[in-house]
């Protein structure tokens, strides 16, 4: 076995160095950082639509509850299990095409319904808004499937968000999901480690 950074991670780090994205994210270049945040604030206030060129093979439908759009990916039959998928994006970027491909593959490989919420993002919204909407979404999933048939998956900042919301379930008398899968979770939001 070979341990180390994947080719994608190495390429992404190179891209960040070349474009100054990491410096902007860390606030080292204040003007670029402010531009980056302003761009995402404006982008996130627009209604989200899945790009037409993303080749999703699963059946898909959308619903809006309490102002949060949620996409549901499913197979042809009745899904007996569900996945709540929280995408990454440093808490300010909308779901990317790579996230969609991952969610689609997850649905097709597991046969589970994959719920993909377009949750409120910074800087226009805070974690309390996202937590409240996601807890309500999870409660609806528990009522439909039962907690023992639900997996919560989060990657990067979505992994940090997933870890955070499951900690709050006890306050709402909600059962824990059967599984919590964190893919490279962003647990240190100070970005100093």
Regions found by a protein language model. Name each.
Residues 1-75:
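A glycine/proline-hinged amphipathic helix-loop "lid/cap" segment
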Residues 62-71, 77-193:
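Alpha/beta-hydrolase superfamily serine-hydrolase fold, recognizing
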């Amino acid at each position: 076995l070979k341990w180390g950074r994947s080719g994608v991670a190495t390429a992404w780090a190179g891209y960040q160095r070349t474009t100054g994205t990491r410096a902007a994210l860390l606030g080292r270049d204040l003007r670029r950082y402010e531009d980056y945040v302003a761009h995402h604030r404006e982008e996130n206030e627009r209604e989200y639509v899945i790009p037409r060129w993303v080749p999703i093979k699963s059946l898909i439908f959308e619903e809006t509850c309490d102002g949060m759009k949620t996409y549901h990916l499913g197979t042809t039959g009745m899904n007996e299990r569900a996945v709540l998928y929280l995408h990454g994006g440093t808490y300010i970027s909308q779901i990317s095409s790579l996230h969609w491909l991952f969610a689609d593959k997850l649905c097709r490989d597991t046969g589970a319904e994959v719920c993909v919420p377009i949750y409120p993002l910074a800087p226009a919204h805070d974690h309390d808004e996202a937590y409240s909407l996601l807890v309500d979404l999870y409660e609806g999933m528990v009522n439909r499937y039962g907690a023992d048939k639900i997996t919560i998956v989060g990657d990067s900042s979505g992994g940090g968000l997933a870890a955070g919301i499951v900690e709050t379930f006890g306050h709402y008398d909600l059962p824990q999901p059967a599984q919590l899968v964190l893919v490279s979770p962003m647990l240190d939001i100070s970005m100093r480690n």
